[in-house]
Amino acid sequence: METAIIAGTGIYAIPGAEFQEQVIETEYGPALINVGRIEGQEIAFLARHGLQHTVPPHKINYRANIRALQKLGVKRALATFAVGSISRGVPPQSVAVVSDFLDFTSGREHTFFNGGESGLAPLDECSVVTAP
């Protein structure tokens, strides 16, 4: 499956879709992913706060969730969110695309890198490719 919906506050199901829960084990812990179909398209549905909204934002295991989606073969994800806006031009229930994002959270991991082999090459081993 190549598509996932990562749902935030207020979205715990998709009308007309039937899902089966799967617990995907990752090196960051288990993640609960619901797998099903929407209009013939197989998708993964991840309720970020849990299906009963029992997981507060600072307790969400983001790394396990993303790694689980990767293990399922997901290539693209649509994420929903329910936050306020500082612009009167974006009233409640608006559909918006985030172009800038500042993450001021603390107390949780912000990377998948845990040391060791990083996949980065020393500069003397790199080549520069330029496009015309």
Language-model segments: residues:
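Metabolite-binding pocket within alpha/beta catalytic cores that recognizes anionic/polar moieties
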Residues: 1-125
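Active-site rim beta-loop-alpha module in soluble metabolic enzymes
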Residues: 126-132
